[in-house]
Amino acid sequence: VPTILTTVIEERGGYLIKGLQDVFPDQKPVNRTFINTWEDSNVTDIVKKSGRKQLVLAALYTEICLAMPAIQALGEGYEVFVVTDASGGVTAEAHDMAVRRMVQAGAVPITWMAVLGEWQSDWARTETANGIASVVLEHGGASGAALAWELQLLATTPPETTGGH
């Protein structure tokens, strides 16, 4: 899945969250000055070049860095999914109001676990199943605990976690 990472004025401390950068160690984030990512042609050119019309977005500051590009991309005909539990606002209310605003504009709210499940789709897809299971075991909360229990009952070795998820 093509992924675009962005930062805001990196030289002033706008670095990407380390855990996220660890997942994409070879990718240099687009260092932008625009508050609305969608106004930065360095970002939109990458999106247009990909040919994709569905966007899955997450951001720190839901009410600004997520809502602004999501709403603008919707206006340009993109189908936008906003990963609500991988995003956050300055307050719970700010996050909730921003999600409502995006939904009113046509965005589809989704959780990271739902994205993961939709992309995996079938556990028979063995090329990705172990990686997905590792992520669920490490970050899946009750679902991860249930998977660990299932693996234990079946006397199955859990996939090795590579970290950085």
Question: What label would you give each PLM region?
Answer:
Residues 10-165:
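Active-site-adjacent betaalpha module
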